[in-house]
């Protein structure tokens, strides 16, 4: 499944492009803005300490790094007590090295999550004068809302834009905003459909002269090039631009407050919101959006707490100062061939780093609600997107050493790179954990006691190996636990998530399903890393937005090999020892059952049945904001229209 939109057998005849009313302008007068390509080999950090940086930011970062180091040091000391008595072999040295890196990885996430939990419970972390509980500010400047699109269903796309447009109009400040649909569509029939639906939208909301449409003839540099083209042609008319994704929905209230935050803080270059994932209907989408709603704030508030004025950019649902972006975020083409060379794929991290190098503050405001997106409907769709992100993040290895970057910006990129390398590292850790007892004790099929890695590790460490396992699992699962505690302390949110019992059941079920899918994700992420290192490009396809519809042949093509491999591993492990098969059970079961698990979680009826039972519920379903209700109404109505594609 490549996620692209395919022609329908019942399509409506489309008029030629020239049939658009020539008297109705689709673009405003151009206001060019220079956007030079940045030099990664030259440059210096313009401002080291930002005015809007929170007090004690150095202490916060010391806590994060010091806490990570201290927690990891304790775990390594215990691990050494397991390995040291008989000396450390080559395999044990490899195990120790992997353990240090992986435990430090999860320890940093744990330390950040603890900070996020305290911030959420204390209702702290508000900054830039953006307070959603205060009256709506009056704006003074113009802002462009940009919605890039690439081979998307135009009716669905513009239904979301219409909901945003109407929500902004309800604030009484529509005159401060223009809306742009920036098309990079390559399929001609979809391009013609975009123009027709755009015209219908403008007629419907009287948006001519305020809603604009532009389709590039050459979609060079993908989304980054799409936005850069707009900046170079029209950016001079708009002090701010708010970047949307094709599935983004934002309330007018939130948009106005973001613009006011930029107007009142002239040294801020970017403000990133925390988009809540909504509208999930398949089991997979619903478990993802529940996890994002319950654990997501803990994680987001944590990183915002120590990011300070060096926050990251996620590519959408964020407002950017146009002049700052033009001056500092022109992306160069990286030297070499794909996948590491060429256009920057994960452009958002790099744009944020370059803007911070240029002296602009970058902030995240996770407390500001009213920002929404949709998640992939199936694990397959997630992994297709993840493969593209893998290539983009690994490509940052060519950018992380650029001159003049703030060290936190470099850290963002290293974390992004590390996210994908942890998958093969976890796999190696498990294999070495089995290999050490095999090398140490061998396999005696005729012995009184069958081979058991668990017995080996327990017997050789006086129980310390068990403590390492318990501590590792606690650190891994702590964000879920902290998210649940924070939910219990917020009666309104708790009620909207189904109450304490149903929320606990949801967390437990999400954890079990995530554990079943973890071996699949680990394998495919590891394969993605090796493919990128081998030079295989990910390409660029449109994303699937609606319910996933995975056929059994497609499932067997995607996961058949992994299923056979899991069954083979299970048979070999059982032949050696049932205890070994039990030790490897979580990985074997996840691989062997990958087809039915992906099929089950891809079903809409399963997800909706759990919703009726109060499982995986989120506040936006109990009391949906008006903009989401309107977007859903418009999309349902659009689905009833004759297909244009």
Curated annotation (Swiss-Prot):
Keyword Metal-binding: no
Membrane topology: Multi-pass membrane protein
Region spans: Disordered: 1-32
Biased composition (Polar residues): 1-13
Cellular compartments per GO CC: plasma membrane
GO terms of biological process kind: glucan biosynthetic process
Annotated compartments: Cell inner membrane
Catalytic class of the enzyme: transferase
The protein's Enzyme Commission number: 2.4.1.-
Pathway the protein takes part in: Glycan metabolism; osmoregulated periplasmic glucan (OPG) biosynthesis
Protein's name according to its UniProt entry: Glucans biosynthesis glucosyltransferase H
Organismal lineage: Bacteria, Pseudomonadati, Pseudomonadota, Gammaproteobacteria, Lysobacterales
The encoding gene: opgH
């Amino acid at each position: 499944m490549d996620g692209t939109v395919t022609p329908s057998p019942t399509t409506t005849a489309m008029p030629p492009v020239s049939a658009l009313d020539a008297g109705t302008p689709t673009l405003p007068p151009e206001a060019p803005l220079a956007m030079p390509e940045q030099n990664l080999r030259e440059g210096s950090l313009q401002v080291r300490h930002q005015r809007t940086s929170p007090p004690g930011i150095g202490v916060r970062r010391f806590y994060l790094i010091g806490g990570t180091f201290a927690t990891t040091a304790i775990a390594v000391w215990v691990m050494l007590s397991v390995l040291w008595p008989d000396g450390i072999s080559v395999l044990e040295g490899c195990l120790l090295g992997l353990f240090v890196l992986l435990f430090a990885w999860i320890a940093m996430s744990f330390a950040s999550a603890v900070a996020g939990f305290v911030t959420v419970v204390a209702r702290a972390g508000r900054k830039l004068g953006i307070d959603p509980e205060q009256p709506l500010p009056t704006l003074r400047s113009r802002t462009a809302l940009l919605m890039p699109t690439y081979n998307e269903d135009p009716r669905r796309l513009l239904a979301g834009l219409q909901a945003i447009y109407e929500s902004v109009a309800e604030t009484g400040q529509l005159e401060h905003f223009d809306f742009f649909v920036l098309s990079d569509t390559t399929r001609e029939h979809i391009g013609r459909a975009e123009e027709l639906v755009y015209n219908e939208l403008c007629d419907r909301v009287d948006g001519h002269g305020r809603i604009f449409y532009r389709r590039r003839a050459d979609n060079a540099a993908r989304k980054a090039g799409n936005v850069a083209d707009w900046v170079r042609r029209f950016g001079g008319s708009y002090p701010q631009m708010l970047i949307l994704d094709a599935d983004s929905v934002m309330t007018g209230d939130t948009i106005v407050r973001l613009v006011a935050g930029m107007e009142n803080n002239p040294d801020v270059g970017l403000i990133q919101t925390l988009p809540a994932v909504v509208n999930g209907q398949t089991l997979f989408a619903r478990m993802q959006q529940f996890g994002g709603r319950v654990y997501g704030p803990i994680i987001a508030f944590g990183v915002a707490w120590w990011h300070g004025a060096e926050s990251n950019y996620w590519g959408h649902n964020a407002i950017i100062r146009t002049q700052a972006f033009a001056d500092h975020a022109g992306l160069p083409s990286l030297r070499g061939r794909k996948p590491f060379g060429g256009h920057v794929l994960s452009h958002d991290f790099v744009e944020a780093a370059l803007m911070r190098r240029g002296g602009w503050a970058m902030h995240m405001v996770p407390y500001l609600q009213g920002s929404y997106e949709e998640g992939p409907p199936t694990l397959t769709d997630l992994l297709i997107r993840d493969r593209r992100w893998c290539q983009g993040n690994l490509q940052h290895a060519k950018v992380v050493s650029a001159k003049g970057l703030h060290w936190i910006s470099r850290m963002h990129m290293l974390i992004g790179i590390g996210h994908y390398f942890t998958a093969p590292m976890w796999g190696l850790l498990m294999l070495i954990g089995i290999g050490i007892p095999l090398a140490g004790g061998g396999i005696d099929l005729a012995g009184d006691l069958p081979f058991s890695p668990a017995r080996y590790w327990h017997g050789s460490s006086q129980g310390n190996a068990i403590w390492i396992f318990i501590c590792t699992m606690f650190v891994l699962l702590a964000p879920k636990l902290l998210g649940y505690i924070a939910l219990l302390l917020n009666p309104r949110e708790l009620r909207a998530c189904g109450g304490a019992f149903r929320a606990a059941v949801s967390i437990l079920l999400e954890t079990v399903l995530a554990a079943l899918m973890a071996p699949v994700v680990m394998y495919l992420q590891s394969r993605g890393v090796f493919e990128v290192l081998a030079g295989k490009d990910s390409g660029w396809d449109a994303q699937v937005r609606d319910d996933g519809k995975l056929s059994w042949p497609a499932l067997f093509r995607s996961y058949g090999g992994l299923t056979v491999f899991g069954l083979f591993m299970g048979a070999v492990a059982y032949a050696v020892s049932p205890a070994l098969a039990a030790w490897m059970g979580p990985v074997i079961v996840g691989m062997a059952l990958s087809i039915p698990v992906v099929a089950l979680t891809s079903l809409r009826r399963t997800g909706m049945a759990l919703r009726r039972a109060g499982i995986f519920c989120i506040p936006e379903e109990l009391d949906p904001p008006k903009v989401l209700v309107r977007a859903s109404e418009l999309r349902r109505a659009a689905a009833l229209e004759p297909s244009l594609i």
